Amino acid sequence: MAISLTEEDFVVKVFDYKNDKEWSFRGDRPAIIDFYANWCGPCKMLSPIFEKLSKKYENSIDFYKVDTDKEQDISSAIGVQSLPTILFIPVDGKPKVSVGFLQEDAFENIIKDFFGF
């Protein structure tokens, strides 16, 4: 199940954007973050897919959600401009960004291709 992140959680679990200039992931396994808003239609369509995949990969990938209305500083620091924005984060290396709704098969293909699962 996806975990909602506050600014405090994000800084501890993902990236300390306030103090680090270069990307430095703080997690110990891959992560996927859904940047969404409750009023966003495509975000609502993505939500059940995101939850389903979070259960399927719960033993290997951390799934997080960030409400862009509540956590505007995080969204701004990451450069979120459109919703939904999905951040695929490997343990080492730079994250991959996907903007817009993803069908379940396309979402899972990115997981398999990017993370090698």
Curated annotation (Swiss-Prot):
GO terms for molecular function: protein-disulfide reductase activity. InterPro entries: Thioredoxin, Thioredoxin-like_sf, Thioredoxin_CS, Thioredoxin_domain. One of its GO terms (cellular component) is cytosol. Gene3D superfamilies: Glutaredoxin. Disulfide bonds join 40-43. Residues 2-116 form the Thioredoxin domain. Keywords: Disulfide bond, Electron transport, Redox-active center, Transport. Pfam families: Thioredoxin. SUPFAM superfamilies: Thioredoxin-like (SSF52833). Participates in various redox reactions through the reversible oxidation of its active center dithiol to a disulfide and catalyzes dithiol-disulfide exchange reactions. Belongs to the thioredoxin family. This is Thioredoxin. It comes from Borreliella burgdorferi (strain ATCC 35210 / DSM 4680 / CIP 102532 / B31) (Borrelia burgdorferi).
